[in-house]
Amino acid sequence: MGPASGSQLLVLLLLLASSPLALGIPMYSIITPNVLRLESEETIVLEAHDAQGDIPVTVTVQDFLKRQVLTSEKTVLTGASGHLRSVSIKIPASKEFNSDKEGHKYVTVVANFGETVVEKAVMVSFQSGYLFIQTDKTIYTPGSTVLYRIFTVDNNLLPVGKTVVILIETPDGIPVKRDILSSNNQHGILPLSWNIPELVNMGQWKIRAFYEHAPKQIFSAEFEVKEYVLPSFEVRVEPTETFYYIDDPNGLEVSIIAKFLYGKNVDGTAFVIFGVQDGDKKISLAHSLTRVVIEDGVGDAVLTRKVLMEGVRPSNADALVGKSLYVSVTVILHSGSDMVEAERSGIPIVTSPYQIHFTKTPKFFKPAMPFDLMVFVTNPDGSPASKVLVVTQGSNAKALTQDDGVAKLSINTPNSRQPLTITVRTKKDTLPESRQATKTMEAHPYSTMHNSNNYLHLSVSRMELKPGDNLNVNFHLRTDPGHEAKIRYYTYLVMNKGKLLKAGRQVREPGQDLVVLSLPITPEFIPSFRLVAYYTLIGASGQREVVADSVWVDVKDSCIGTLVVKGDPRDNHLAPGQQTTLRIEGNQGARVGLVAVDKGVFVLNKKNKLTQSKIWDVVEKADIGCTPGSGKNYAGVFMDAGLAFKTSQGLQTEQRADLECTKPAARRRRSVQLMERRMDKAGQYTDKGLRKCCEDGMRDIPMRYSCQRRARLITQGENCIKAFIDCCNHITKLREQHRRDHVLGLARSELEEDIIPEEDIISRSHFPQSWLWTIEELKEPEKNGISTKVMNIFLKDSITTWEILAVSLSDKKGICVADPYEIRVMQDFFIDLRLPYSVVRNEQVEIRAVLFNYREQEELKVRVELLHNPAFCSMATAKNRYFQTIKIPPKSSVAVPYVIVPLKIGQQEVEVKAAVFNHFISDGVKKTLKVVPEGMRINKTVAIHTLDPEKLGQGGVQKVDVPAADLSDQVPDTDSETRIILQGSPVVQMAEDAVDGERLKHLIVTPAGCGEQNMIGMTPTVIAVHYLDQTEQWEKFGIEKRQEALELIKKGYTQQLAFKQPSSAYAAFNNRPPSTWLTAYVVKVFSLAANLIAIDSHVLCGAVKWLILEKQKPDGVFQEDGPVIHQEMIGGFRNAKEADVSLTAFVLIALQEARDICEGQVNSLPGSINKAGEYIEASYMNLQRPYTVAIAGYALALMNKLEEPYLGKFLNTAKDRNRWEEPDQQLYNVEATSYALLALLLLKDFDSVPPVVRWLNEQRYYGGGYGSTQATFMVFQALAQYQTDVPDHKDLNMDVSFHLPSRSSATTFRLLWENGNLLRSEETKQNEAFSLTAKGKGRGTLSVVAVYHAKLKSKVTCKKFDLRVSIRPAPETAKKPEEAKNTMFLEICTKYLGDVDATMSILDISMMTGFAPDTKDLELLASGVDRYISKYEMNKAFSNKNTLIIYLEKISHTEEDCLTFKVHQYFNVGLIQPGSVKVYSYYNLEESCTRFYHPEKDDGMLSKLCHSEMCRCAEENCFMQQSQEKINLNVRLDKACEPGVDYVYKTELTNIELLDDFDEYTMTIQQVIKSGSDEVQAGQQRKFISHIKCRNALKLQKGKKYLMWGLSSDLWGEKPNTSYIIGKDTWVEHWPEAEECQDQKYQKQCEELGAFTESMVVYGCPN
């Protein structure tokens, strides 16, 4: 073929010209994350397709509204780089980005490719990093200290130095502490602490933290505040299956695993109850309550299908499907010393054991290409189900699920653009077809551009990826015929953690349908990433096409760096206090925050631990990608992967609407004779079952119940009851009414055996719940690049398992949480002293020391001692030590109960020591017990005042007088605390909602026509853009529409210049005289538009100059000589009345609005404004029209002249104080009221503003329509100003000061808006009146609360139970073991005080010293058809059966239930410690009652002396004098001069008062032989108090005289009402009368008493 002719060439050129893309005109594109984060490095990808040569590119990021350049970068796209480049940008935080405002913020990313500009508006996020909060524990007691660290990291999880705001909030969400701290130079770790007050709200507290510039991006951690003691063991509940088949006949089996914290197994009893949970509603299955024995740490319980179905209504299986089961377990140790509760919930009731999910499957497929179905199979509890075969229906693709529960099925799709229905089912051989899980999904076809057949499909292999692996990504191509050669490469992008991590090209050779990319997986890819790929071509339609696909890939969650905590492998058996080593391995330079926590803490609360998976959860939530891959079209692919894409050809992604992805919709033996009679009677019953009923009726029981009452307990039917009553009545007519080998008390003989003395035993006393709160730096690395730090630590005194938790932060590898390292600490003999959280002063309580012997075969004989502490009344006294000797079998424990009465408030020490005979083994434990005052803690409100100095004060100062609290009912000798609480009320006067931006679409119009019509057309667009800018509503309106609107404003501006006359004035046409009003309006509109587009200032200011020079008269009035043709455009000015003032005000307003631009160009502008203002002032009081009052009022307000009297007229003109109204003039009224609103906003009269705005909003006026120009312009100008001004109306700046009389200086607080709701408090122990002053702006609240212990009106010690315990001697006829020294009957009677019987209740009984229960009596009570008790348990150790637990099926609420059984005394002891009985309900452990018993004390109470609510222990010997002692002068002198003796008196007994608990002796002081701290004179009286048990020993007689001395510690009460206690150290000696001294019997004594007195008075004591 020859050369083309000229005409052919022309045609060819024309054809090419008509299809510019075909000429290879390059396509330029920008790709950016569709959310850009402030202060973060972000990547923007720039590309040129089909380009030649080098292309310089400038990328700028501009503020969306003002187009200010925030950052700029330059690069060059070269051929060598394939015209692909990435630039890194960082948007600085600035005041432009104020996250306080509602709505989203945007920037415009602009790429200048030489002549071609591509720009895209992108959403901005204030998240410039993360804050992770670690507390040293998860649960705290009042008065303890919370230690916490805040890790400040950027979006790459690397340490960052920034300002952080930290709040601590109560469970009610009220902040009580606010800190603003910088993490600069802190290596990203802020260590903090907070002391929890003693008086504090219990519940879940929160630490909330945020970066100062991003107050809405809040990170939080919770901790619990509760009164608790750490448990000694943990309980786990493990169901055999994690779900329950609804038709499973075997029911649900659960295992209960109980282990001590130091790893040994628990023996005890578990109470188990099951229930059904439906949402938040829990239904307990009462009949499922069972008691399970825990042996060697394990017990099993079963919920039968029958019990389940009987317990719910309706009792059909279908109604239960979808609900879940829960099981609650309470485990009690055999010793009764500890109890732990555990619950397992969320055991789903299902028809199939599996669930199928398509959450990891894309929702779009490419026709005729493989579709990768990622099937996620879970167990009903949501955990991944591995090794389950899944198949698709129809295509029969099959695969096994992996460990993560995911199976990949690839199915071939038809070449059809119809939705594809895919059904997947499980195929588990062991399951019937009806129980297989099935799920159906619908996939939609990917939509190509121009209906082409160009597709791209990405597929990846299914494997668990980790850093260091390579991932093969398959690119499958399908195109229209003949087009595949055009595709020379694919562009791919990797998105991770919201960041564009990587951009690259994958080359495609001609003919390759499949191309494989090998992608190295680096730590940066954790925890998951998205790979997006696309190609572009000129399609069959001749137009540019983009084809894209994406795939989401999971990476194994782990630290990006390394952190491991190890111990010394040789340290297998660590004991308390021992030294051990810790090895910390991690990245060089990392700082590691450590803490050691007692595992018991996590038994109580394990919810709030910081773990690596929690860190990844937070990071994943910030992922801006929204689907598992693919998309509905090319733009959807980019959009769903979190990318914004735009090309020079206008191809682009939609605007992102929210920072977060949209969530899918939710989804006893008798006498032989009596025995024979019984056998005869029973023999009458031939039926074996009835004979048993008869025999049980003839059993003797200790309780005096009638036969009929006993029979009520029988459940075996009517015949059994008849036989039982018959035989019971028979034996009643015939019947005649017929201990623990425990060495206790002061067994002195044993002290001679080989045993460690008490004083040589060092007690364990340091039991922190957490420690090792340190930050360690890892220095030089080893060869493998890992740094190691070895720490030598000394373990604390606890016997437990310590969890060592470590969190590291490294400059290169970021944050890492190590797996916890456990250190187990124990010894084979130890004491566990179980103390309650707190006890009440003067109330008797029982504590238990549990002694453990973990030796394999050796029984230990142990002496255990409670040490004396004068703060308690107990069997241990200053004179007598309290020992017990017990035997503990191997691998066993024994509980030793101690009864104490706390006498002093505060933290008091309890110490128990134990030593093993003939071994060098001992242990001691010293713990503190919190003793609280009697009565009830009361929070009494003394005063509540509103602080508002401006409204409630005088001269801006408010004074408040606060009285002292009335504490007349306060418990004596207790403190009170007055809390002065201040809180600001940061009340934002809530702005009325802005007019919905979408309603303004009709205002965007194209201006046209004459000089007046053009302004009518330009007005609505200018004011709409201004309003949408000010209210930040472009998102609703359409981000891309703003540029279009600006183009229209530019057009209107250009067109208006055509009507500018040489004088710079304006008219409708150039041949008409210029118009004052129109020129002023042009000035007004152009002044506003100057913020939006480029306006020539000479044009604007020329018009201003013309108005002043040509149209203002000397009196300041502006005149109109060229009225406008379109009178409808001038609004309320159209009414000729008061025209001069209206026009002058209108022009004045325009001049003021142009002032910022023109003041430098028009010298006469300020003078002109002043003249016009003076004219308006002079005319204002005579104005009649509300319109003129409003517009002139705004003009005056602009000059700061709207003051009285003008202000009064302005406000009074308003109808109902909300509108400036003329009859039947809606548009004028909207315009006038808008002017008035602007005036009120300038005046900052924010109280008057809301009703006006409400009225304007109620008009539902959205502008537009004939005659609406002024109303439209003014209403949106005013409402925009309102939205700008009012949210900033946050007035709170108040100084509050008060001076407490007991303090030297005043206390001052400043309440500011920023921290207004922060609770400030000041505490004082003084109860006093004070005054407070407040000055400043805003409102606040003062609350004054007195916290103190008030006396209870009646003593309430029992909750929901009545309990009576008595002990009486058994008759001689009672059977007892040969070795028993004494036998008694213990009777326990109880009644439940609720509305129904108490089911499953427990009696916890402590035996008196030396006593043990009769096991045959207990067997009798627990067997037979009339069972009185379900079961009983005693300590395993036969030598120490000192605790007995009895389980009762029920306790009646209508009558007393009584149990009586014998107790035998096996050893006589010097001091019998009282026993105790506690009854409580399993269902509610708070419902309990405790009573004490003792053979010599009716109520089992230890002796104490109480006087004016102060108590002293009186369990010791009564007084010093022993009549058999040999007493002489020297003995008396020595004793009276011993250290501590305070006084020596000669007294006469004048009165005796014998009371219930103590005796009061009134003595007249005859002579003060040695004066003491009580300044008593001879002749005065004093009271001497003695416990009743000393009455017989003292035998004091009225009228007799006595020599008395005692210690200062026995003086009681305040002067002058001092009383004296007669105690163990008091000397009481009869002083014979003068007549008695004549008797030889008394002569020597009388002489010595005289000499004693003389020596003491004359010489005193030698020391």
Curated annotation (Swiss-Prot):
InterPro entries: A-macroglobulin_rcpt-bd, A-macroglobulin_rcpt-bd_sf, A2M/Complement_sys, A2M_N_BRD, Alpha-macroglob_thiol-ester_cl, Alpha-macroglobulin_TED, Anaphylatoxin/fibulin, Anaphylatoxin_comp_syst. Disulfide bonds join C559-C816, C626-C661, C693-C720, C694-C727, C707-C728, C873-C1513, C1101-C1158, C1358-C1489, C1389-C1458, C1506-C1511, C1518-C1590, C1537-C1661, C1637-C1646. Residues 1634-1659 are annotated as: Interaction with CFP/properdin. It holds the Pfam family NTR. The record marks A747, R748, S749, Q954, G955, R1303, S1304, R1320, S1321 as: Cleavage. C3 precursor is first processed by the removal of 4 Arg residues, forming two chains, beta and alpha, linked by a disulfide bond. During activation of the complement systems, the alpha chain is cleaved into C3a and C3b by the C3 convertase: C3b stays linked to the beta chain, while C3a is released in the plasma. The alpha chain is cleaved by the serine protease complement C2b component of the C3 convertase to generate C3a and C3b following activation by the classical, lectin and GZMK complement systems. GO terms for molecular function: C5L2 anaphylatoxin chemotactic receptor binding; endopeptidase inhibitor activity; receptor ligand activity. The keyword Secreted applies. There is a cross-link at C1010-Q1013 (Isoglutamyl cysteine thioester (Cys-Gln)). It comes from the Eukaryota. GO terms for cellular component: cell surface; extracellular region; extracellular space; protein-containing complex. PROSITE patterns: ALPHA_2_MACROGLOBULIN, ANAPHYLATOXIN_1, ANAPHYLATOXIN_2, NTR. The keyword Kinase does not apply. Residues 693-728 form the Anaphylatoxin-like domain. Disruption phenotype: Null mice displayed altered lipid metabolism and morphological changes in adipocyte distribution. There is reduced adipsin/CFD expression, increased number of smaller fat cells, decreased DGAT1 expression and activity, and less triglyceride storage capacity associated with delayed postprandial clearance. Mice on a high-fat diet exhibited no diet-induced up-regulation of adipsin/CFD expression nor adipocyte differentiation. Glycans are attached at N939, N1617. Residues 1518-1661 form the NTR domain. Complement activation is inhibited by VSIG4. The modification Phosphoserine is found at S40, S671, S968, S1321, S1573. In absence of complement activation, the C3 precursor is first processed by the removal of 4 Arg residues, forming two chains, beta and alpha, linked by a disulfide bond. Precursor of non-enzymatic components of the classical, alternative, lectin and GZMK complement pathways, which consist in a cascade of proteins that leads to phagocytosis and breakdown of pathogens and signaling that strengthens the adaptive immune system. This is Complement C3. The lineage of its organism: Eukaryota, Metazoa, Chordata, Craniata, Vertebrata. The gene is C3.
